Structures are given as structure tokens and as C-alpha cells.
Amino acid sequence: MKSNTSQYIPYNCISANLLENYEYPESPFFRGTGFFVYFPPFDDYIFYVSAKHCFCGYKENNFLEKLKIPYQYKTEENFNNSLDEAVIFSEYLTMKHNEEDDDFEDLIVFVVDKNIKKEKKLLLKTRALRLEHQDNIDKILKNLCNIEGNIRTVGFPQVSKEIDFDTKQARIQPRGFYGKIAIKENDINRYKFKQPSWKEGEYNGFSGSPILEIISFYNSNYEIVMEAIPIGILLSATKH
């Protein structure tokens, strides 16, 4: 990602969605991206967020056991180990824009089991992005739209993922891009990239990636700190 803010991109928050194959359990496959978040002051809860359409074809009660996300951020993994040592999720959440809507949002939130070992929870906490309150996110988005500011994303497109079934090795590389934000007309809470920097073909695999804004603030030592804040999720993209 060519940008002077690339040093602040939190690569370790993301994971490629590794899914167990119904018909061939020993041949898992990748579909989309997801990322870990937490929401102060409820620090006991850690969530994994992705696009719901990444799980099409799976019965809803099988989501939890078929998704295999490693506790540690890795770009190379023996997927036999990943299937055995995967994050345990206790439930998942789906949502609507309001109760009167017939359709659910293309969004799914997995809840990390609170009973996992302390060291594993701490490991996930270091990977998780801090969620802001919605009022703050709305202000950030409004300001970005007014100034046509840049937004960023990072994920695992298909061009950066490889599975070798002979050696049972999975290799993935995170990729990112940025572009100017614009409101998507006639859609509630939908935005789009203008002039995206992605030049490597299709966007397949980016679904579920976090949309990021880099903000600065003063810490307790009155030092300026830069932090990547999730302000949305990438649901779809088309090469023009």
C-alpha cells in the first residue's frame, strides 16, 4: 500500500476466513476477510466481524464450527493445525437497519467465547481494533465526505492466497488500498471508494475487510499517537 499512513495500518487485526469444506473436511478453502474488534468499556467481549455473504451455502447453525480463525496472525500456516487450534466462538449476531426491514444487513459478528484461556484472550485483545461510539463514527464520516478525504482498507484478496493441498500449507499475504470516500446514493449508511489505488485485478477476497481512518490524539504523556479506527466494513467491490 503506497501511502504515508501505511505504517499505521493494523495488519494483525485481520484474518482470511478459512472455512471447513462440507464434502471434503480435509480440504478447507478461503472466502473473504474478517477482523477483530472490541468495544470499551466492555473489554471482556471480543468480536470477529465479516461480510455475511462470505458464508453463503452454510446452514446458519454451522457458522460457528465451520469458521477456522487462528489465534495468532500468520501469513503461512499448516491448515491441519488451524483446524484443530482455532478461535472458539460462542454465538453470532446479525442485524437490520431497523426492526421494520425485511432483510438483514450483509454483516455478521462472531462473539469470541468468554471462557477461552486468559493468554488466548490477551492475544486476541492485542489484535482487536477499538470501536468508537456510533456518534463519533458519524462525525468522522461526515467530515471525510465534506473534504473528500481518503479511506483505507486491508484484507486478503484471492490474488494473495494460496493453498497447497499436498503439503497442507496455506499462504496468504495482506494487501491494501485507499481512495476517496463518497456517499452512495439511495442507500442508507452506504459509502463508496472513488479513485481507488488498487491496480492488481479483481477485488475478490476483500469482502469483510475493515474500512479504516487514521486519527491522531494525545496520550496520557501528552504525546501525539496515531491510531487506526474502524469506520465501516467493505461489502462489495467491482473493477471498472
Model-derived features: where do they sit?
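Catalytic histidine site
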Residues: N4-E91, D113-I116, K180-A182, K192, ...
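Short, solvent-exposed loop/turn segments that connect beta-strands within catalytic domains
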Residues: E23-P28, P40-Y45, D103, S216-A228
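Beta-rich catalytic cores
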Residues: F30, D106, S207
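Terminal peptide-recognition signature
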Residues: G34, S50, F110, E148, ...
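Acidic, polar low-complexity intrinsically disordered regions
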Residues: I69-D102, V109-F110, K117-I137
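Short glycine/Trp-rich loop-beta-loop segment that forms part of the substrate-binding cleft
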Residues: A128-R171
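A mid-sequence, solvent-exposed acidic-amphipathic segment
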Residues: G155-K199, N204
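Catalytic nucleophile loop of clan PA
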Residues: S197-I233
